Structures are given as C-alpha cells and as structure tokens.
Design a protein with these regions (language model features):
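Short acidic (Asp/Glu) patches
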Residues: 39, 69, 80
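A short linear-motif detector with a strong N-terminal bias
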Residues: 24, 33-34, 63-66, 75, ...
Length: 190
C-alpha cells in the first residue's frame, strides 16, 4: 500500500489571485491556477509479479511525453487519476499498459475534479533504431451527456550519440475525435 498527502497554501502575503474553475475570487484578480488544497495525492494498492504490475486506487499516470496523459507536474497540485491500471512487460523490448479511470483529479483541487469513464491503452516496441508507440486514449466525463474525446496515435522516438554530441529525434501522429452535445469534431496532430 502506498499513500501520499499534499498541502499547498500561502504562508506569507495575501491570496490576491483567482483560481479559475474552482470559483475562488472569480473576476477579482489575475488567474493563478494553483489553489490551496489539502488532499490525498496518491493512495493505491499494488501487486507486482515478474513482468506484471497492477494498481488500484489514486495514482500518477504519465505516458510518453505527457502530451495527452500526464501529471502536469509543474503545478503545485499535480493531476492524478482514480482507477485501476495494469502494465505488462512482455519482454525487454515490448510492454503494454491499460487503465480504466473513474475520476480525473485535476490541478485545480477537488472542486474541479471530473468523474469519468476513461480507457487508456499504450503499447511500446523498442528496437535498435528507436521506440515505436501506439496508443488509444478514450476519455469521457461521466455526466450523462455525450462528451467523448478519443485520441488514437503513433509515436516514434530515439537517440543517437556521436563522440561529442547526443541527438534526440521523434515523430508523432495523432487523430482526435470529439463527441459533444454541440456536434462531432475531428482534429489531427503531427
């Protein structure tokens, strides 16, 4: 069992700022998206056996470059997720990750968390030339409305060293579709 609690608050000075979606000082001051929360950051049960890791509870999930799924770790209240996850390391070069999430604990503290029905799938294959990743992130806020945001993508990244310089390279393509009460939209990223 692992647990971690966090507390962020003003020690000196005043609270002359606004925390966007939490409703704190709305419209009165500049937005600083760092509320003063005291909350459980992580609390999960974990099972590990050879290549399999299972977690159930509140956990940090950061996939690939954090572009679509990450903890937003530069904020005072990092993003965590409630749910179950499984990572299976098939071999030294292949691993697969799956998570079902029923809550996104966002950076704005508990007042702005989302109940959700999210599925995260991420698979990696490492070669001498680099790492190939395929993913599907199927996000849905659990509020009885059509609001799905589905992201499907592939990513390739690697590095190369010369005698004096290290080089990193990467390419990514993702397609995103959104289903909401106002209609369907689609976007592509590369």
């Amino acid at each position: 069992f692992t647990a971690e609690v966090e507390d962020s608050r003003i020690v000196m000075g005043q609270g002359d700022y606004t925390v966007g979606p939490t409703g704190y000082n709305v419209g009165e001051n500049s937005v600083i998206a760092d509320p003063e929360p005291t909350e459980v950051d992580k609390a999960f049960l974990q099972y590990k056996n050879e290549g399999l890791t299972l977690k159930a509870g509140r956990q940090v999930i950061a996939l690939d470059n954090h572009r679509f799924i990450g903890h937003v770790g530069w904020r005072q209240d990092r993003q965590t997720f409630d749910g179950v996850s499984a990572k299976y390391v098939v071999s030294e070069n292949v691993d697969v990750f799956y998570a079902y999430l029923n809550q996104r604990n966002r950076i704005f503290a508990e007042a702005a968390d989302f109940d959700s029905k999210d599925h995260l799938i991420n698979a990696n294959f490492k070669t001498k030339m680099g790492k190939f990743t395929a993913y599907a992130y199927l996000l849905e806020v659990d509020n009885d409305t059509a609001n799905g945001l589905d992201t499907y993508g592939i990513r390739y990244s690697g590095s190369y060293k010369t005698q004096s310089v290290g080089w990193g390279y990467g390419a990514e393509y993702a397609s995103q579709t959104s289903e909401s009460g106002s209609g369907d939209t689609a976007t592509e990223y590369d």
